UniProtKB/Swiss-Prot annotation:
Organism: Chromobacterium violaceum (strain ATCC 12472 / DSM 30191 / JCM 1249 / CCUG 213 / NBRC 12614 / NCIMB 9131 / NCTC 9757 / MK)
Lineage: Bacteria, Pseudomonadati, Pseudomonadota, Betaproteobacteria, Neisseriales
Chief location bin: membrane
Entry function: Hydrolyzes the pyrophosphate bond of UDP-2,3-diacylglucosamine to yield 2,3-diacylglucosamine 1-phosphate (lipid X) and UMP by catalyzing the attack of water at the alpha-P atom. Involved in the biosynthesis of lipid A, a phosphorylated glycolipid that anchors the lipopolysaccharide to the outer membrane of the cell.
UniProt KW Lipid biosynthesis keyword: yes
Matches recorded under HAMAP family: LpxH
Record-given protein name: UDP-2,3-diacylglucosamine hydrolase
NCBIfam families reported in the protein's UniProt record: lipid_A_lpxH, PRK05340.1
Reaction equations catalysed: UDP-2-N,3-O-bis[(3R)-3-hydroxytetradecanoyl]-alpha-D-glucosamine + H2O = 2-N,3-O-bis[(3R)-3-hydroxytetradecanoyl]-alpha-D-glucosaminyl 1-phosphate + UMP + 2 H(+)
Cellular compartment(s): Cell inner membrane
Length: 237
């Protein structure tokens, strides 16, 4: 059976069409594929495993149902880096390190969210290093839930304002040097990642790099891996 890869769904309480597309997709794929890998930013933000936001109930329940029949793996992204053991218990998913190397259908596949490869964005890389620090995370998770939500909403608003002002810029894309260093360190496998919202297929010497389609406006996409190779396919209307 095929393996499917998705990323950058950015599910939130104000994205009902995307939330429903996720539920429908899990129902359609449950028990019919070998595994599903979600490579970061499943949620627009994740303020801690104790988050009791009402909109989370449906996707987490659907994930549990899915994981009961089909292996489900989730990688943390730049929006949901606080996913932890509590999320695993609530969703039935298994969290993956970034990067993770798998072997399937005769291929060596390196999985990453992709944000660590955007090395020209020095300010973001500084934030990434800080936000992955266990002490920083412990301090953040010690704050009241309402305060964490307020911080996340502010960060989301700031991010949207920056996007409107600058759009997709070169510094928000991966760099050739970072990609080549990562591929070389793992023996030049095929690389699959998300994050950049620039779905495409690239070649780096003998290695392929696939960028997964982000989800928006009730539509999305996924990568399918089977004995015939890797293909990019659409989801939604």
């Amino acid at each position: 059976m095929a393996i499917h890869f998705i990323s950058d769904l950015h599910l939130a309480d104000d994205t009902p069409a995307l939330n429903q597309l996720f539920l429908d997709t899990l129902a359609a794929w449950r028990g019919r594929i070998a595994a599903l890998y979600i490579l970061g930013d499943l949620f627009e933000y994740w303020v801690g495993d104790d988050d009791d936001s009402p909109y989370l109930a449906a996707p987490l329940a659907a994930m549990r149902d899915f994981a009961a029949q089909t292996p489900l793996y989730v990688m943390r992204g730049n929006r949901d880096f606080l996913l932890g053991a509590g999320f695993e218990a609530r969703s039935g998913a298994r969290l993956l390190d970034d990067p993770t190397l798998i072997e399937a259908h005769g291929q060596r596949i390196l999985l990453s969210h992709g944000d660590a490869l955007c090395t020209d964005d020095a300010a973001y890389q500084q934030f990434r290093a800080m936000s992955r620090n266990p002490q920083w995370q412990q301090a953040m998770l010690a704050k009241p839930l309402a305060e964490r939500h307020a911080i996340a909403r502010h960060a989301r608003a700031q991010s949207e304002m920056n996007k409107q002002q600058t759009g997709l810029t070169d510094i928000s894309d991966v760099t050739e040097n970072a990609v080549r260093e990562l591929l070389a360190a793992h023996g030049w496998p095929t690389l699959i990642h998300g994050h950049t919202h620039r779905p495409a297929h690239h070649l780096h010497d003998a290695s392929s790099r696939w960028v997964i389609q982000d989800w928006h406006g009730g539509r999305g996409g996924y990568l399918l891996l089977d004995d015939g190779g890797i293909r990019s396919l659409p989801l939604g209307n």
